[in-house]
Amino acid sequence: WQVRVEDDGRALTCWKQRFNQDPAYRGDRTALTTLWSHHLVKRPENQLTGVGFLHGGYHLSHGQYMDGSGAFTVHRPEHWVFSNTKLQVNDEFGGKDTIVGYECDGCEIEWREGLPYPTGNDGTPTNFHILATASAKWHPDDSDWYDAWQPGREGCAVMGLYQQGGTVFTVGTTDWSHGLAKLNGTVDIVTKNIIDKLAF
């Protein structure tokens, strides 16, 4: 959420879903305190992280995908992120620990020859590598306040990375840490690969 500092620095304000009640709605709409990716703000978090909530949604939460696996499906197992995991194309991982859950961030995807690619239309860098995905969906009520979205629109959690000066890696889910309890489990190995590659 985009917030605004007010009251001489003593308060942070965010109108969130009630953005049309924000005083900025009648003036400089780029200062609206709502989603960064809202079409009136036009500063999608995808430009920084590669993913955002607009093309994500919920998984095992808010009544969406309540029978979901809680797992990611692998699309590019040859990537160094998956080194030492033995994962193959279309394998799932993390379901036993429900690593995909609650809020999920994604990006607009197009499929070419069986592989997902970012369209770049939502601010996601076109050199973003989509490594794994999981189904996600907005709650129908969310579409009531965000008029640019159709109710029932499907999204996904997206795990991936891109380089622009440095490397930005994202797992696109709030519940990734659930998989870290198992020493040498897949999530633990992937996390170690990332730290080993990017820490030095």
What is each residue range found by the language model?
Residues 38, 45-53, 57-58, 63-68:
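Non-catalytic, alpha-helical, charged scaffold/linker segments
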